[in-house]
Regions:
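Helix-turn-helix DNA-binding motif, specifically the short coil turn and the N-cap/start of the second
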Residues: 4-9, 13
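DNA major-groove recognition helices of helix-turn-helix
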Residues: 16-18, 91
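A short LG(V/I)-centered, amphipathic sequence patch enriched
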Residues: 18-35
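Alpha-helical linker/hinge and terminal dimerization helices associated
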Residues: 20-21, 42-64, 126, 261, ...
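Interdomain hinge and pocket-entrance segments immediately C-terminal to HTH DNA-binding domains
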Residues: 61-80, 94-98, 142-143
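C-terminal regulatory
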Residues: 108, 134-214, 219-243, 263, ...
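Periplasmic-binding protein-like
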Residues: 239-254
Length: 270
């Protein structure tokens, strides 16, 4: 009844399938017919094929109407990812067939990835916006960056003495997240660097390195608020350079999905 087919029609269909594949799909157990292992495999894999077919049809329909099937996004390491993924979740609820590919970028790396078409959308990229690259950029509220060290780091004793800090910083090791640029000139942000640096790959590594007392560095405050409250990290009384963050994409990219997602991200309160 659920299939809206007569029993005879189902039996005939199963018989034809068994003849074509030269296998048994059902076997008798008493008065009941049950699936053979081969039949169970066909059932399970058939469901996947049907789901894939539906998804393919949805993607083809969106593509035919100007909606690209995939968006590649570079999210800056200082970005509040909880806000980002909330917006992304709302977007995917409206566009379930869309594929999303997210990577993390640092400093110049995101702009370079956008310029060289490795990503379609840049979220949270630090300014300034590169000129004459054909980018459309929308400013968003930047993450508050705080200069911190571990409470047991030597600089912690000077945390409230700006003059002493200025003298000590050039001799203190900095913890720096690698710029992800592969072609363009990389850059650093935050402290004026001395000669001693420890480079890490991710913001998580940077936080752990600073908690371990390996050096100093700027970190988004929302990422370390718990450690500040616990007294494991100490904020240094230094002027923090003003920063500006952007959502950016190429002006030449007219994809409807990109435009819709960029608008949602731009309207969000970061």
């Amino acid at each position: 009844e659920d299939l809206n087919k007569a029993t005879s029609a189902l039996s005939y269909g199963i018989q034809k399938l068994e003849e074509q594949l030269d296998i048994s799909v059902f076997q008798r157990q008493g008065r009941r017919s049950v699936l053979t292992p081969a039949g169970r495999l066909i059932l399970n894999e058939g469901r996947k094929i049907l789901e894939s077919t539906v998804l393919l049809a949805d993607k083809a329909k969106e593509l035919a109407t100007g909606w690209e099937p995939k968006i590649r996004i570079a999210a800056e390491s200082t970005l509040d990812h909880s806000v980002f993924f909330k917006v992304l979740g709302d977007f995917l609820t409206e566009h379930e067939a869309m594929d999303i590919d997210v990577c993390e970028s640092v400093l110049s790396g995101g702009w370079e990835a956008l310029e060289h078409d490795r990503v379609d959308l840049l979220v949270g990229a630090p300014g300034p916006v590169p000129l004459q690259k054909g980018f459309r950029a929308v400013s968003i509220n930047p993450s508050e960056m705080v200069p911190v060290v571990a409470s047991h780091h030597p600089l912690a004793r000077l945390a409230n003495d700006p003059e002493a800090l200025k003298e000590a910083i050039p001799m203190t090791r900095a913890v720096v997240t690698h710029d992800t640029a592969m072609v363009d000139v990389t850059r650093n942000a935050g402290f004026s660097m001395g000669k001693k640096i420890i480079y890490v790959q991710t913001m998580d590594q940077k936080i752990e390195a600073q908690l371990a007392g390996l050096g100093m560095g700027h970190i988004p405050k929302f990422r370390v608020q718990r450690y500040l409250d616990e007294g494991r990290l100490v904020v240094l009384n230094l002027e923090t350079p003003a920063n500006e963050n952007f959502i950016a994409w190429k002006i030449s990219n007219k994809g409807k999905a990109l435009q819709a997602l960029a608008q949602k991200l731009g309207e969000e309160t970061w």
